[in-house]
From Swiss-Prot:
It comes from the Eukaryota. The gene is FOLT1. The chain crosses the membrane at residues 10-30, 74-91, 110-130, 164-184, 216-236, 274-293. InterPro entries: Mitochondrial_sb/sol_carrier, Mt_carrier_dom_sf, SLC25A32-like. This is Folate transporter 1, chloroplastic. Ubiquitous. The lineage of its organism: Eukaryota, Viridiplantae, Streptophyta, Embryophyta, Tracheophyta. PROSITE patterns: SOLCAR. Disruption phenotype: No visible phenotype. PANTHER family: MITOCHONDRIAL NICOTINAMIDE ADENINE DINUCLEOTIDE TRANSPORTER 1-RELATED-RELATED.
Length: 308
């Protein structure tokens, strides 16, 4: 497998990441605000549901509020998806080496996805932390608001130290299972659809068998499975990544503290706050990601680079 193939995957993944953020960011803001609102003294307004949240943010904060944290989200998503598809492709290539059958087992797809997810998490956690904090800023924010991405980085390092950039890394690493589940489900469902279509049209290659509607269905269905199994860890990470109060005391100390407090005051429901907004965002977002990724990859394969 040529090195250019890996860069084709990375490029297609980066373009897919950008397209996904551009289309769905406002729902990401809503989801994040629901996730951290534990009902115990918050600078955020109380929202009744997803639609109410969208209209309230638009009315009180305007378009800027709905797109809070957009710049780090674009950087984070573009870099994350680019790296993810690159590492994922490299891992699959390594596991396939020396095998007579090029098709990998579900376990090897899972291992490839987990490996890629862990590497991406370590590379991008600071970007996601800044994105979360910018999304939680409102006109009523109690502390001096960050003016943007660079100011947020500088202020966090100055006030909390460099280690603060990796708050939420533990649940983030656990969330590697999210991507692993999604990609394994995607690959296995993709095999089923390809096999069904190959029986009908034996003359076409795999690339031509699937269309954008297939990629949308595969991306959406695989995302639902991953979200339902791993969503509580997204809530835990978001709560850990909140900005400390004006006296510098964080609301939560670590992941176990979040789990204890959430279970005590909110019960199981607390771990699924923002789930509706999350599904409304991520199911179509995942479809967009895979539609763009597969089509950009197909385009790049039709016009390959000369480098190996």
């Amino acid at each position: 497998m040529a090195a250019s193939w890996q860069w084709e995957n990375a490029t297609a993944g980066a373009v897919a990441g950008f397209a996904t953020v551009a289309a769905m960011h406002s729902l990401d803001v809503v989801r994040t605000r629901f996730q951290v609102n534990d009902g115990r003294g918050s600078s955020l307004p109380t929202y009744k549901n997803t639609a109410h949240a969208v209209f309230t943010i638009a009315r009180l904060e305007g378009l800027r509020g709905l797109y809070a944290g957009f710049f780090p989200a674009v950087i984070g998503s573009t870099v994350s998806w680019g790296l993810y598809f690159f590492f994922y492709g490299r891992a699959k290539q390594r596991y396939a080496r020396g095998r007579d059958d090029e098709k990998l087992s579900p376990a090897l797809h899972l291992a490839s996805a987990a490996e890629a997810g862990a590497l991406v998490c370590l590379c991008t956690n600071p970007i996601w932390l800044v994105k979360t904090r910018l999304q939680l800023q409102t006109p009523l924010h109690q502390t001096q608001p960050y003016s943007g991405l660079l100011d947020a980085f500088r202020t966090i390092v100055k006030e909390e130290g460099p280690r603060a950039l990796y708050k939420g890394i533990v649940p983030g690493l656990v969330l590697v299972s999210h991507g692993a589940i999604q990609f394994t489900a995607y690959e296995e469902l993709r095999k089923i659809i390809v096999d069904l279509k190959e029986r009908r049209r034996k003359s076409e290659s795999t690339d031509n068998l699937l269309n954008s509607a297939d990629y949308a269905a595969l991306g959406g269905s695989s995302k639902v499975a991953a979200v339902l199994l791993t969503y509580p860890f997204q809530v835990i990470r978001a709560r850990l990544q909140q900005r400390p109060s004006t006296n510098g005391i964080p609301r939560y100390i670590d992941s176990l503290h979040v789990i204890r407090e959430t279970a005590r005051y909110e019960g199981l429901r607390g771990f699924y706050r923002g789930l509706t907004a999350n599904l409304l965002k991520n199911v179509p977002a995942s479809s967009i990601t895979f539609i763009v990724y597969e089509n950009v990859l197909k385009l790049l394969k039709q016009h390959p680079t000369t480098k190996d």
